[in-house]
Amino acid sequence: MPSTSFPVPSKFPLGPAAAVFGRGETLGPAPRAGGTMKSAEEEHYGYASSNVSPALPLPTAHSTLPAPCHNLQTSTPGIIPPADHPSGYGAALDGGPAGYFLSSGHTRPDGAPALESPRIEITSCLGLYHNNNQFFHDVEVEDVLPSSKRSPSTATLSLPSLEAYRDPSCLSPASSLSSRSCNSEASSYESNYSYPYASPQTSPWQSPCVSPKTTDPEEGFPRGLGACTLLGSPRHSPSTSPRASVTEESWLGARSSRPASPCNKRKYSLNGRQPPYSPHHSPTPSPHGSPRVSVTDDSWLGNTTQYTSSAIVAAINALTTDSSLDLGDGVPVKSRKTTLEQPPSVALKVEPVGEDLGSPPPPADFAPEDYSSFQHIRKGGFCDQYLAVPQHPYQWAKPKPLSPTSYMSPTLPALDWQLPSHSGPYELRIEVQPKSHHRAHYETEGSRGAVKASAGGHPIVQLHGYLENEPLMLQLFIGTADDRLLRPHAFYQVHRITGKTVSTTSHEAILSNTKVLEIPLLPENSMRAVIDCAGILKLRNSDIELRKGETDIGRKNTRVRLVFRVHVPQPSGRTLSLQVASNPIECSQRSAQELPLVEKQSTDSYPVVGGKKMVLSGHNFLQDSKVIFVEKAPDGHHVWEMEAKTDRDLCKPNSLVVEIPPFRNQRITSPVHVSFYVCNGKRKRSQYQRFTYLPANVPIIKTEPTDDYEPAPTCGPVSQGLSPLPRPYYSQQLAMPPDPSSCLVAGFPPCPQRSTLMPAAPGVSPKLHDLSPAAYTKGVASPGHCHLGLPQPAGEAPAVQDVPRPVATHPGSPGQPPPALLPQQVSAPPSSSCPPGLEHSLCPSSPSPPLPPATQEPTCLQPCSPACPPATGRPQHLPSTVRRDESPTAGPRLLPEVHEDGSPNLAPIPVTVKREPEELDQLYLDDVNEIIRNDLSSTSTHS
């Protein structure tokens, strides 16, 4: 394959080399006239022999050579400089046959000479020294690379010895990066003109130094690193060479396709002696640069990984003026390491190369400045110990140290963990909730102030149950308010508010790329903090949406929560972490003006039967607004969804009346939490509001004085004179028959089914009715009705039999026994309406006469529905004054134990009822039932 060659005229100026050639000293065997050059393979394998002149090879575009090693296109034409170009370096060589520069021993098959002009191939002269005008290898430089990776040598041009290489008084050929290096005509022509070659592949000339792309990835250093000096060139050019120097200003200039140092043109001898031609160092580097030498920001930063090794070597050679100085002195300030401490030792495998190859190598931690000559480096990156080339141009600044208060132990839970709000005696509670709307401020505008509370002021958070004297740190961050699990919000961050009106101190910290506001909880303030120092900052949507793995959209995710977290140390050494989140906060001004907003609801729980009216207070309600009840699974999916009926006639912009829909499961045994929202359109929904469905089949029993009139939804006119007392008398759950057939009062239509459950709360717990016995003084037993009474003496507590359907009780559910059984004694004629089985268990053989009405203790059951007929004839005759003695010594009353989950014990517990003295008006359910039935009997008799 024909290779690209550079035709050179016979008068080739070689400067001082002319003297050597003139004396007839040859550097190799005399070539025969018309001889041909050796092939590349033969020259490569015979490189170390003494009869072949080693020289500086200029790699050509050979088919067997990798392109990155040569970077020369075969299509690039050779540059033929004019023959009359002035030399300027030394005497011109007048004559000499072309074959003088060629290797001998071969001719073309047709007998023609191999080349009309010599082909110049320049190779490294490192490892060669002058001995009787012959070049010999003191150390095989090629041993650095494996034989399979060596570049095959081609025909070479013999050059003189190192002493005759240059004249110290003349211009430095090394200041130019041209491949002619001896101030040839082409070199001068190249130095004066710049060529638009963007890369080494398009350049017609080759650099003698190691190409930046010749780095061997397996060995970690360039192939020709042994041919490059690392301790700097011994002397710089005293004169000007066009753009040969690399200053601090041009260090980040345009990046060249060639390194910034000649590297191979001036060397120390390998035996440790400094060559005599350069006894002193040039005080300053060349003020100008040669073509394609300057390094710019664009090319340097864009090609950092390609040119790291060669660019570092080039920079050191170009900027080092004294070999005894530290290598860092010649490195630009912008390229040095930011740290000032020197590494304790530079682990280098260096071996002095001299006549005695068996001498032991120096210690590995030998300082590099103690060597005045170049050392043979087998492994490691010497320059990397002094230069840290960054992969990004903006990583020079040191990271900001974390404050001691922001240090978090790795054992503390992450911000996206779901933590409880109470554990044991500790409870973290938001005493005052924040306002449902807060205008978050952008990064480009000023603060919008701290988050405020709905009733004025600011949110308040308190830790209950903490009795120690050590303060704790309350953490606050902005969390999500969507259907998914609580986590830090991607588009909003907490913002620290300061000013004269801010009374709470705070500190900002960064935890897992989330800004956290730390607020102290002080024991002298009862572990209570007023959150008047927290605002909300809106981040730029594009910055967050372009993150890897981010799927949320900023404009659709404008609701947040204030998430508070505290870590309580335990005596065992562990840390208890509590977390509580506020109500959702709308941060978008547009959303606050268009989306419906629910601020208050009249009720937050109701039995599963539904049907009650609920009033919603808020903003942006319309006539066509819909209220949707939904039940969500733990993973966020909707299990149940139901649209509630709204009263359009009563709808106002700030209020909405809705009927609670029945729940999907009417037989729940524990409260079920659901949510509802108001919808004005497809994308105009309010925030989710919580609602609780309660189990059915439990009556509502209240204790009401007669002088405090308040209507209640009770059965018949009896309830018109009743009102609830402020204090409940028992908190257990009682049961009522689920079907109308369990009503034991004959002559009246059965009550429709009414299933309710009252939780153990003071506001809604079952209470007793306080009725006067005067309303029942005209009662006479009727043969056609069941007559109930309490004849047992004081202190007697008869055992209660387990009957299928006792009075005012029910079995609850098929697998659940009756939670309460009331002791009753029934006396009735055979015409009684009691069932046979129930009559046998409740009616004893000896009937007992009823007690006088004045001594009876009446009670009243909460009715099933307002449609029931009146239970008494004259409720208006109730006395206006009733004796009340709330003595706690009224006597024990045992009821079945009810667990927190709402399910009673599996086995029924006997109920013990003690008769109260006559002066006490504390009535119980069984007493009231007896009085009611007696009164009903008397009313029927008189009618």
Swiss-Prot record:
The keyword NAD does not apply. It is found in: Cytoplasm; Nucleus. Residues 703-943 are annotated as: Transactivation domain B (TAD-B). InterPro entries: Ig-like_fold, Ig_E-set, IPT_dom, NFAT, p53-like_TF_DNA-bd_sf, RHD_dimer, RHD_DNA_bind_dom, RHD_DNA_bind_dom_sf. One of its GO terms (cellular component) is transcription regulator complex. Residues 439-446 bind DNA. Residues 126-218 are annotated as: Transactivation domain A (TAD-A). The keyword Translocase does not apply. GO terms for biological process: aortic valve morphogenesis; calcineurin-NFAT signaling cascade; intracellular signal transduction; negative regulation of vascular associated smooth muscle cell differentiation; negative regulation of Wnt signaling pathway; positive regulation of DNA-templated transcription; positive regulation of transcription by RNA polymerase II; pulmonary valve morphogenesis. Residues 118-123 are annotated as: Calcineurin-binding. Changing S172A: Partial nuclear translocation. Residues 201-214, 236-248 have a biased composition (Polar residues). Phosphorylated by NFATC-kinase and GSK3B; phosphorylation induces NFATC1 nuclear exit and dephosphorylation by calcineurin promotes nuclear import. Phosphorylation by PKA and DYRK2 negatively modulates nuclear accumulation, and promotes subsequent phosphorylation by GSK3B or casein kinase 1. Residues 22-48, 200-298, 787-912 are annotated as: Disordered. Rel Similarity Domain (RSD) allows DNA-binding and cooperative interactions with AP1 factors. Member of the multicomponent NFATC transcription complex that consists of at least two components, a pre-existing cytoplasmic component NFATC2 and an inducible nuclear component NFATC1. Other members such as NFATC4, NFATC3 or members of the activating protein-1 family, MAF, GATA4 and Cbp/p300 can also bind the complex. NFATC proteins bind to DNA as monomers. Interacts with HOMER2 and HOMER3; this interaction may compete with calcineurin/PPP3CA-binding and hence prevent NFATC1 dephosphorylation and activation. Interacts with TLE6/GRG6. This is Nuclear factor of activated T-cells, cytoplasmic 1. The gene is NFATC1.
